[in-house]
Amino acid sequence: WWDGVVAAVRQAMNGLSDVVNIRAIGLSGQMHSLVALDSHDEVIRPAILWNDTRTSEQCREIERRLGSDGLRHLVGNPALEGFTAPKLLWMRDHEPKNYSRIATMLLPKDYVRLKLTGVKAMDPSDAAGTLMFDIAETRWSSAAVAKMEIPETWLPEIVPSNKVSGTLSGEAAAALGLSAGIPVAGGAADNAAAAIGSAVTSPGTAMVSIGTGATVVAPIPNAAVDPGLRLHTFNHAEPDGWYLMGVVLAAGSALAWWRDQTGGGQSFDELVVGAAETAPGADDLTFLPYLTGNRTPHANASARGAFVGLHAGHTRAHMTRAVIEGVTFSLHDSYQLILAQTEAPTELIGTSGGMRSAFWQQMVADVFGVPLTPVKSSGSPYGAAILAACAAGKFDRPSEVAPQWVTRGKTADPIPAHAD
């Protein structure tokens, strides 16, 4: 990751005539993934990523230790395989020597922060996805980590997303070709940053992001937790904000899998052309996109994908459309639960790879029954930049500037006939 940061920053600097005007650095990264460090801040083992589902046994242990009330009231989320705490317990059970060496637990963007500044810190939006954070009080949950017997000393300082977490060290500045002392913002988890970068900062707005996985995010006014723990409640990068989130683990990756299994060689745009020419419903063919399990709303890591209703008349185009529809309807399952807990948005904001497709934009609008407007910028990086501007003192809250800075594309209105 650090090598990638160095290469990317130096490449970006090649296109700038005056690097001294860089006022701050923003951070964003994938949620949940465990970076375990020893007492010398050296990485102990390769990171265990967010979509790794090896921790089912540890999740059941956490459920026993915390109970459903503890999960709701201490950490505000279900014990799911992708979260960070189960990964620590997996290391305890399967890599005891590595586990005994842990001195600090970080997430991906926070490891990059450490390399940039020498500071070990995490923002609330990422901490919320560890299963060790009190989302209502915006602090580590001493009670939860005690019940899981995870040392609280491993947990880094919490810093606000929109404030300075540290400054660029001389060593990092030399590696990047920048000036030492540049402020580094607290930053945000990828979905929280994408919401900031899409101007989805307050209740009544919602965002659909489709990349490797897919998410639907809806800001809420308080730390309300789904009674059935079928959704996530996370801290927003907007100060004193929270959001509900539903997740499809295999979204763009399901389409990539389908392309690769049928010969590959086509770009996603080429693959989608045939699907777009096929009528909605894919001739009664249904695809279940559970290639890596289901996260919300069913929380079943053992769930598996399937084509249902396949007959000899179905073509590759039908099956491609079924894959895209399956991802969209799976995400809609979570959206229906969100609507039961917060006000319905008047429009959806689309971001990330899948939402660059006009075909997929229209499908989301049709299935959700809400107009969808894509943003032209890349949500997470743009959100990180807005948070950097706040850390530099240009603004106080992301919501002050995001609506003015975010450029929107053409709105896709629902076509009722497509949903029938």
Regions found by a protein language model. Give the residues of each.
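N-terminal phosphate-binding loop and adjacent alpha-helix
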Residues: 1-19
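ATP-dependent carbohydrate kinase catalytic cores
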Residues: 132-239, 250, 266, 270, ...
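Glycine/Thr-rich phosphate-binding loops that ligate phosphate moieties of nucleotide
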Residues: 3-7, 23-65, 97, 118-121, ...
